[in-house]
């Protein structure tokens, strides 16, 4: 049994109502419920946190190490383009992670094209809406079982 942690960055608490043309109509609660169900069906444990505060995400990453978290799925949202601190926290705990974005950041404003995470992530999924989280979970479980 693996333990996975899903981290959602700033403004993702507004999913379903925030710019649905860019981010879709699925709520964060629906995404989390789907991931929890899929993990549970596979015999795994899934934790999640959404925060608009960078320090809360960093502290959660630090705690993940001592909790035995095996893999992290992270949508850093706006912190993607600004947070060296989150990047450093992920590197410090040495837990593999996949970066997820609902929208295709490469089709958006130029400042969104740069990520502080992509070069150290196992992989990046962007532009596939809420399905990206499901695909990231599947990929993480394949990585953990050696089927990747």
UniProtKB/Swiss-Prot annotation:
Gene3D superfamilies per UniProt: Dehydroquinase, class II (3.40.50.9100)
Site label Transition state stabilizer, positions: 18
Active site annotation, chain numbering: 23 (proton acceptor), 101 (proton donor)
Pathway assigned to this chain's UniProt record: Metabolic intermediate biosynthesis; chorismate biosynthesis; chorismate from D-erythrose 4-phosphate and phosphoenolpyruvate: step 3/7
Annotated protein name in UniProt: 3-dehydroquinate dehydratase
CDD domains: DHQase_II
Binding annotation for substrate: 75, 81, 88, 102-103, 112
Broad class of enzyme this protein falls into: lyase
Keywords: Amino-acid biosynthesis, Aromatic amino acid biosynthesis, Lyase
Purpose: Catalyzes a trans-dehydration via an enolate intermediate.
Catalytic activity: 3-dehydroquinate = 3-dehydroshikimate + H2O
EC number: 4.2.1.10
InterPro entries: DHquinase_II, DHquinase_II_CS, DHquinase_II_sf
MF (Gene Ontology): 3-dehydroquinate dehydratase activity
Family: Belongs to the type-II 3-dehydroquinase family.
Biological process according to GO: amino acid biosynthetic process; aromatic amino acid family biosynthetic process; chorismate biosynthetic process; quinate catabolic process
Assembly: Homododecamer.
Statement: the UniProt record of this protein carries the keyword Cell division: no
């Amino acid at each position: 049994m693996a333990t996975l942690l899903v981290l959602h960055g700033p403004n993702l608490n507004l999913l379903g109502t925030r710019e649905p043309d860019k981010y879709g109509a699925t709520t964060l609660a629906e995404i989390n419920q789907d991931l929890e169900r899929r993990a549970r069906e596979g015999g795994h444990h899934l934790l999640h946190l959404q925060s608009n505060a960078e320090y809360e995400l960093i502290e959660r990453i630090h705690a993940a190490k001592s909790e035995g978290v095996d893999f992290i799925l992270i949508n850093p949202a706006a912190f993607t383009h600004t947070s060296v601190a989150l990047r450093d926290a992920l590197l410090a705990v040495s837990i593999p992670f996949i970066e997820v974005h609902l929208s295709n950041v490469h089709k958006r404003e130029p400042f969104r094209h740069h990520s502080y995470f992509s070069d150290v992530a196992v992989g990046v999924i962007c532009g596939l809406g809420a399905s990206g989280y499901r695909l990231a979970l599947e990929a993480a479980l394949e990585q953990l079982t050696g089927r990747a």
